[in-house]
């Protein structure tokens, strides 16, 4: 294959389950030099009179050059082609609570944004998933006896941690000696027929980080607190606080939530809503087996793209496992009819996050969409994005 380019953008999406790949070589700039492109099992090579650029693929991915098909040139985008691959991508999600020994260690809860210690040296003896919101209906339909837990809330004991879709429930009774996170002010509300007003906290009071003032969660009762997964890092007390860029952490947590929920409940459509019940984003999970490799600039040096690196620097790797989603922004009263349809559909699952995090996620999706080749940015009325895992 031959083309002319001064700089060429390379985009490669590998699908682990389908064992296929989409390769896009960006449209060259005017006046670019002739360039020969070679596709080899472990690399892509681009030669110009000035030199050679080679892009090394991760060890887990091998292309099948002879399977090249669907070759076409898309104006404004570049050269498109599809290939078969031999890919062994690790898609197993690792939770901090997967290992039974982890629950016997002392853990420390940190604010992810600033590293403030929220709960120190908590020994978690039981880490349990919460039942789904349809649990009561299932019991009533399939069991011959009434549900003994009807209309009762599940509250963790002193050394428990209950895991919801996007949050942790913990008991703060044993943490009273510590400096606790701030609570939002109580609100005035009328509670009697005589319209006498008294101070009464909201049903779910915001829990705020004292250092950075980020919303971490909500109080469920006098002893139980809900912490959102996107705001808290739970780490063994023997380890130091891990510094992770905010955008990387948010999209990784959301991606894992989507994958786990789709696997457990066969749910692929989600509404992302704030703690104020306002819907910010409609998300549709397309697939969770993508490996995206991209080179944003041409260089005469060899570029290597390891599959997963232990560093979280944004420029350290251009290869990453990801989930592919369709999304619709719903801020400023956009897509109101579609939001209403999705909210009334029992197959759509709501995910509640702090309102500020919903806006962060929308920015992350928008940036991902803007970085895609132009032909991949839309599917019908939905926008396309990748969330790194």
Curated annotation (Swiss-Prot):
Location of region: Interaction with UBE2C: 235-257
Subcellular location: Cytoplasm
Annotated motif BRAT1-like motif, positions: 129-159
A molecular-function term among this protein's GO annotations: ubiquitin conjugating enzyme binding
GO annotation, cellular component aspect: cytosol; nucleus; ubiquitin ligase complex
Catalysed reaction, written as an equation: S-ubiquitinyl-[E2 ubiquitin-conjugating enzyme]-L-cysteine + [acceptor protein]-L-lysine = [E2 ubiquitin-conjugating enzyme]-L-cysteine + N(6)-ubiquitinyl-[acceptor protein]-L-lysine
Keyword presence, RNA-binding: no
Enzyme class: transferase
EC number(s) stated in the UniProt entry for this protein: 2.3.2.26
InterPro entries: UBQ-conj_enz_E2-bd_prot (IPR019193)
Binding site for Zn(2+): 144
Pathway entry: Protein modification; protein ubiquitination
Region named HECT-like: 353-389
One of the protein's GO biological processes: protein monoubiquitination
Domain remarks: The C-terminal half (AA 188-389) is able to bind cyclin-B and shows a self-ubiquitination activity (mono-, poly, or multi-ubiquitination) in a HECT-like sequence dependent manner.
Subunit structure comment from the entry: Interacts with UBE2C/UbcH10 (E2 ubiquitin-conjugating enzyme). In vitro, interacts with cyclin-B.
PANTHER family recorded: E3 UBIQUITIN-PROTEIN LIGASE E3D, E3 UBIQUITIN-PROTEIN LIGASE E3D FAMILY MEMBER
Function: E3 ubiquitin-protein ligase which accepts ubiquitin from specific E2 ubiquitin-conjugating enzymes, and transfers it to substrates, generally promoting their degradation by the proteasome. Independently of its E3 ubiquitin-protein ligase activity, acts as an inhibitor of CPSF3 endonuclease activity by blocking CPSF3 active site.
Protein name: E3 ubiquitin-protein ligase E3D
Originating species: Homo sapiens (Human)
